[in-house]
């Protein structure tokens, strides 16, 4: 299969401090080949979107990527990167030694939202030097496309953040299985799949997954294992014990969406914060 890529010209990389012990403020506005930066530097660089930085309190990007054992020389695929919260971190981190595929929404999608999101992401790729090494591919969970998210057996890491519930809500269990199978095909043996999503309590009714935006951790593990993965470890990095996962408008009641009905008190949901999330690390076994 073929795959498409957007590659931008790369210019000089500013020298960055090698200290990991505290947040550093730098500006890797360009991605010329040279010494790799640390993950802490990638998380704390000055080119990140301020609104995204404010969400680090709940999304814990450095701890999450460390849990997935990223290295700057790896080939990494981010699935459905949206506006680029994680791409802003991954692009400069992988610029000098690694390869970064952003597998965004399908080009031929009928969804206006998907088209707008993809168009905005493309604009960022062509206008912001921090994205100079990004190779743009596309991903569809239900029906695999003629193009790949990355060449088969090439990716060291595949990462998906808060996407799986959408695949289930729009395509059911088979869409999730199809996604996992595509990831399995793209990963190298011993490669890692990292999954973060909104967590539905195990005691809740299964049908709550249909429209709440929350899914059960045990169910995700079961489907990943059906697709050939082994669970390596789970983490509570992105847990939020304040979130009951039982809201009138599902996860969208909570920040950052705050989809609150007229007359409801938004401060109740702001006090909860962003959703309770599971963080799972799977491995593609060596045959």
Give residue spans per PLM region.
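C-terminal motif of bacterial Sec signal peptides marking the signal peptidase cleavage site
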Residues: 15-18
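Bacterial signal peptide processing site
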Residues: 20-22
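Class I SAM-dependent methyltransferase Rossmann-like catalytic core
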Residues: 35-71, 85, 89
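Conserved class I S-adenosyl-L-methionine
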Residues: 73-82
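A short glycine-rich, Lys/Arg-flanked "PGG" loop and its adjoining helix->strand segment in the class I
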Residues: 91-92, 174-189
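Conserved beta-strand signature within the Rossmann-like core of class I S-adenosyl-L-methionine
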Residues: 101-103, 190-198
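A short acidic, Gly/Pro-enriched loop at the edge of an enzyme's catalytic core
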Residues: 147-159
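C-terminal lobe and adjacent flexible extensions of AdoMet/dcAdoMet transferase-like proteins
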Residues: 227, 267-287
């Amino acid at each position: 299969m073929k795959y498409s890529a957007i590659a931008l010209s790369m210019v000089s990389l500013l020298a960055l401090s090698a200290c990991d012990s505290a947040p550093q403020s730098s500006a890797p506005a360009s991605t010329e080949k040279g010494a790799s930066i640390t993950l802490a530097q990638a998380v704390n660089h000055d080119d990140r979107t301020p609104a995204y930085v404010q969400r680090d309190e709940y999304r814990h990007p450095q701890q999450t990527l460390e849990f997935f054992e990223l290295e700057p020389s790896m080939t990494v695929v981010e699935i459905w990167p949206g506006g680029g919260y994680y791409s802003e971190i991954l692009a400069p981190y992988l610029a000098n030694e690694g390869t970064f595929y952003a597998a965004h929404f399908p080009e031929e999608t009928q969804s206006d939202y998907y088209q707008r999101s993809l168009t905005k992401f493309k604009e960022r790729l062509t206008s912001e030097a921090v994205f100079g090494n990004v190779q743009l591919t596309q991903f569809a969970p239900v029906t695999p496309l003629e193009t790949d998210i990355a060449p088969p057996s090439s990716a060291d890491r595949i990462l998906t953040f808060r996407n799986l519930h959408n695949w289930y809500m729009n395509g059911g269990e088979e869409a999730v299985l199809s996604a996992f199978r595509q990831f399995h095909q793209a990963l190298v043996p011993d490669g890692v799949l990292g999954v973060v999503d909104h967590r539905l309590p195990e005691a809740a009714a299964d049908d709550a997954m249909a429209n709440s935006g929350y899914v059960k951790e045990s169910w995700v593990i079961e489907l990943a294992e059906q697709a050939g993965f082994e669970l390596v470890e789970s983490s509570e990095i992105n847990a939020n014990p304040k979130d009951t996962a039982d809201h009138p408008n599902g996860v969208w009641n909570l920040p950052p969406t705050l989809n609150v009905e007229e007359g409801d008190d938004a401060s109740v949901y702001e006090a909860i914060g962003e959703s309770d999330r599971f963080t799972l690390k799977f491995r593609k076994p060596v045959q």
